[in-house]
């Protein structure tokens, strides 16, 4: 099995694993709301833990020679992920901005689900390899 094929299969598994991690993150947020604020530490720590899956998705997409959307979409989610911490930082000075934290979480979940669902078709399609002069056969000299 080729390296690019392994990377495409890994991409699909990583994408669904990321969706599952986001669902766990929602659960931990609910735990903080309904079972006591001390549980928000679990929510915060878990969020910092699984974000690295997005980098793995980008790497797998590039190694797997997958379409542009397969690596660009996780990069977009990385931006949304980074915004989560920014929104929380405004909780005392600008609560209206901090209130965007759960809205952004829904955007992250939606994007993650789209990536995971699209991964099946991306797994089947890869960017065609470019031919280099060294890989092309020498032209025949037919007179």
Predicted regions, residues:
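Polytopic transmembrane helical bundles with strong interfacial aromatic enrichment
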Residues: 1-143
